[in-house]
Amino acid sequence: MLVNKVIGLLGVLFATRFTNAVELDLDNYESLQNATSLIAYGLMDYYTGNQYGKTVGMFSDPYYWWEAGGAWGCMLDYWFFMDNDTYNDEIIAAMIHQAGDDNDYIPLNQSTTEGNDDQAFWGIAAMTAAERNFTNPPENEPQWLYLAQAVFNTMALRWDADSCGGGLRWQIFVWNSGYDYKNTVSNGALFHIAARLARYTGNQTYVDWAEKVYEWMVGVNLISNGTYKYVYDGVSIDDNCTKVTSYQWTYNQGLLLAGSAYLYNFTGSDLWHTRTKEFLNASQVFFHDGIVYEAACQGPNSCNTDQRSFKAYFARFLGVTAQLVPETRNQIMSWLNTSAIAAAKSCSGGTDGHTCGLNWFNGTWDGMYGLGEQMSALEVMVNTRALDKPAPYTAENGGSSVGDGAAGTQAQPTNLAPLNITKGSKAGAGIITAVIGISIVACALWLVF
């Protein structure tokens, strides 16, 4: 592996020295390898966890812990689709280190600040490692399937039936702003992980949980009815979850789309097959001339740091949906291929000449840059190979990761932990909430006018 890493890095450095922009020919595997190696190298420029005094698994500011989990999931896709193990040592070290003392992705450095959605994205990365048969950790370390099950179990224990008839709150802890909000990404991620665990393990309990979460989301109108299933942002317990925050984000649509695809592939149910197609129908809202974009914020150029990474997860979920549900392949691969070519043209900026941008419509770099931009370009490009690689493995078909159905339940519960909130704490939380509210109003005004 060390030899491969050295060769891989030398290849990237050579390409960097003599190449000004990413050139991509999707009919040429070597072209795709060269393009994605440049983008992956640029992504890892933001990684600081291998530097003295820094935290293993974490990227530079301003990138939060949850996005680090998303980034390692992206690098797993890069390894799998591009047959490139250059960064595998870093992936393993990061995902083990950040698992925490209880092996449930609630590490001490995040244990009072992380939300359900934050934990979920590390769990999704662990599930990907299990399904792709990624190198297993040493026997004395937690295994990928175990980690994914621990995330699912700890999240499921937080199911809040006392308000709005169920659902997960956005935040785990009462002192964090957003505790009174039940958002789609937390609930959609629980549904998504349950669907993947059902298929991998064959355990019906996970199917039951996926159906439970799905029906609750439909009941509070986070998922629309009809043949186009749009997915909305969240609801507040302050009004008994009766008013929907109607923003649509790519990664929320992708979580429900891919989760439905996993359930159809496992159960063979016509219902989940239909739902998969209906989520795919609604995904059209995120494409213009076949190119993916973040519709809620990209137009007014108001995407924040987190939102600039959402297309990465959407591309990932599109790719796996195409693997699992044959009827979706023509549409999805058309979107991925068109978007990949456009993304490559955007990767022509920065001092290195191949920094990726946010807006892929321009045919050139738009001046934006960051971890999210690199992740999005990389995911959309590597997932053009979705049909050239095996579908996710299961325990009965190629998967070797070892789990435990009770993983995570031995730890001290973190469900709705109490705290004596001071007036100062409430004031601080109020300021944060106000800022979020202003941002939402600004987006709404742009969408209307």
Swiss-Prot record:
Q: Which residues form the propeptide?
A: 429-449
Please name the GO terms that the record assigns under molecular function.
mannan endo-1,6-alpha-mannosidase activity
Its primary localisation, in coarse terms, equals: membrane
The keyword Kinase is annotated on this UniProt entry: no
A single Gene Ontology CC annotation of this entry is:
side of membrane
Q: Which InterPro entries does the record cross-reference, listed alphabetically?
A: 6-hairpin_glycosidase_sf, Glyco_hydro_76, Mannan-1_6-alpha_mannosidase
Magnesium found in the keyword field: no
Task: Could you list the residues that carry lipid attachment of the GPI-anchor amidated glycine kind.
Answer: G428
Quote the function comment for this protein.
Answer: Required for normal synthesis of the cell wall.
Q: What else is known?
A: Present with 2580 molecules/cell in log phase SD medium.
Q: What is this protein called?
A: Mannan endo-1,6-alpha-mannosidase DCW1
